[in-house]
């Protein structure tokens, strides 16, 4: 099989586009075929190099490597449509010379006005074929005189049948398709011409895309026939919708692949989750690695019913992948997050060792990689005590707890979690306090928060020297607040 993903670089990679790329990639990998990336950048006013780069980075992050396309090359270079305009012009001229296309001299403003009126009257806004009736001789004279024109495809009579691999047979009445534009007045190709010429040239034999393209398919099949080319197999994937049943968009929350990367989702979880947006292995299996997906994916189990985007399920699934990681793997995934947030520098490799030790303490509390930040930040930067936690450092009782904790910890020969726990429990007993009440001021002094990973292990990770510094600083905070209150009075 030869399959392609052909995004328009006018913005971010939408999760719907990523799902389409994934299904094409899985089919290529499961069949030993080729996955081609083609950039459809004919919208010159909106396409940007930055968007192209971002789309490629998102695909690479997801692990959807391409066999032909930008950065890797191939036999059908270039893989950007702006570098292929000569092919489109040649195809349009060939159709024109064969009488399968014609020149349209109608002013765009006039066509737009007719389109608006048709919509107002609830009619299909098709071109009225006025220029179709102009003789070739007259059209040639008007072109030679410099009159601007577009090229339109001459739709034949009859019906067009699509044998969709997911939806079965779909029949279109050609009379309702309309003579559509192939080349605009400015010499740029329209989507339908460019995509067909490219798919023919790149020998694409399976077109797998979203069902929003169904209306384009009869136009393209007729164009394949006019160009005397083999028609590929078509499969139109079900739409992805929000919980309100409407097409997934920004109003439903984050929809850009890059945003999920920033939020700490794993590519493995994203691929697993997106694979299930329309396809299933059976009625029960949910967690599947990439190898399982490749071995089992086929269009036979892709349904036509809309797939619902369930962010809660994605978050749960991401948590399952985090739970399955080794300590080293989790540390290697969290480390770049710390670098990105400025908590550590990239060359501070000891951070990985610290994170590896912290992994067992934080893993069960994590659903996303970013969840690690509030739990481990105290290990890499001086703490800033949360406003709602300050009260646990204030007052004579809390100050006594912190002082006694410092004394007990300072006496330890081995600064390990088990010994730390024994020392702090001894402190609580000496002060006739329940352990929970005695431990909270220490927790806030060490981590800056009432909520943290297990206290004794956290203190061990922080180390004796920094622990004593934190406890001393907690005593200073109380002194500063007392002095401040005195000045105000």
Q: Can you name each region flagged by the protein language model?
A:
Residues 3-9, 37-41, 202-207, 255, ...:
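Glycine- and acidic
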Residues 24, 55, 95, 99, ...:
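Residue-level signal for inorganic ion chemistry
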Residues 94, 102-103, 107-236, 241-248, ...:
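Active-site cores that bind ATP or allylic diphosphates and position pyrophosphate for catalysis
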Residues 57-60, 93, 225, 258, ...:
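Generic alpha-helical structural context detector
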Residues 44, 228-233, 237-385, 447-484, ...:
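Catalytic adenosine-cofactor/nucleotide-binding cores of aminoacyl-tRNA synthetases and other
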Residues 331, 393-446, 450-451:
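C-terminal accessory/binding modules appended to enzymatic or scaffolding proteins
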Residues 1-120, 216-229:
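N-terminal Rossmann-like or analogous alpha/beta NTP/dinucleotide-binding catalytic cores
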């Amino acid at each position: 099989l030869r399959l392609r993903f052909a995004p328009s670089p006018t913005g971010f990679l939408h999760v719907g586009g990523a799902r389409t790329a994934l299904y094409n990639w899985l089919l290529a990998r499961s069949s030993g075929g080729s996955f081609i990336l083609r950039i459809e950048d004919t919208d010159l006013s909106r396409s940007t190099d930055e968007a192209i780069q971002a789309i490629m980075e998102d695909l690479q992050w997801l692990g959807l490597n391409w066999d032909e396309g930008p950065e890797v090359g191939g036999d059908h270079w270039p893989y950007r449509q702006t570098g292929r305009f000569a092919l489109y012009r040649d195809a349009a001229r060939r159709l024109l010379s064969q009488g399968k296309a014609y020149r349209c001299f109608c002013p765009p403003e006039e066509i737009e006005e007719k389109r608006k009126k048709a919509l107002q009257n609830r009619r299909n806004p098709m071109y009225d074929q006025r220029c179709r009736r102009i003789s070739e001789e007259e059209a040639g004279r008007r072109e030679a005189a410099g009159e601007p024109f577009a090229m339109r495809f001459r739709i034949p009579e009859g019906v067009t049948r699509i044998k969709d691999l997911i939806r079965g047979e779909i029949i279109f009445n050609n009379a309702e398709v309309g003579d559509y534009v192939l080349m605009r007045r400015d010499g740029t190709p329209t989507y339908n011409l460019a995509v067909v010429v490219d798919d023919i040239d790149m020998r694409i034999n399976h077109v797998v895309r979203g069902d929003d393209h169904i209306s384009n398919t009869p136009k393209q099949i007729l164009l394949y026939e006019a160009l005397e080319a083999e028609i590929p197999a078509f499969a139109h994937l079900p739409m992805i919708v929000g919980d309100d049943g409407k097409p997934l968009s920004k109003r439903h929350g984050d929809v850009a692949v890059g945003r999920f990367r920033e939020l700490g989702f794993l590519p493995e979880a994203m691929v697993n989750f997106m694979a299930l947006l329309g396809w299933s292995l059976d009625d029960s299996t949910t967690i599947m690695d990439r190898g399982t997906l490749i071995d089992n994916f086929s269009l036979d189990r892709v349904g036509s019913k809309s797939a619902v985007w369930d962010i809660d399920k994605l978050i749960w699934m991401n948590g399952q992948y985090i739970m399955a990681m080794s300590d080293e793997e989790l540390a290697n995934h969290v480390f770049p997050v710390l670098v990105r947030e400025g908590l550590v520098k990239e060359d501070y490799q000891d951070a990985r060792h610290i994170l590896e030790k912290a992994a067992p303490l934080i893993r069960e509390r994590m659903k996303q990689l970013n969840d690690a930040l509030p739990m481990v930040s105290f290990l890499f930067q001086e703490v800033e005590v949360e406003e709602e936690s300050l009260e646990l450092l204030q007052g004579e009782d809390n100050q006594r707890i912190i002082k006694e904790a410092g004394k007990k910890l300072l006496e330890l020969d081995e600064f390990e979690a088990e010994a730390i726990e024994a020392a702090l429990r001894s402190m609580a007993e000496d002060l006739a306090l329940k352990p929970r009440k005695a431990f909270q001021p220490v927790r806030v002094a060490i981590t800056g928060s009432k909520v943290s990973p297990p206290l004794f292990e956290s203190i061990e990770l922080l180390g004796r020297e920094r622990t004593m510094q934190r406890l001393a600083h907690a005593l200073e905070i109380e002194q500063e607040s007392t002095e401040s209150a005195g000045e105000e009075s």
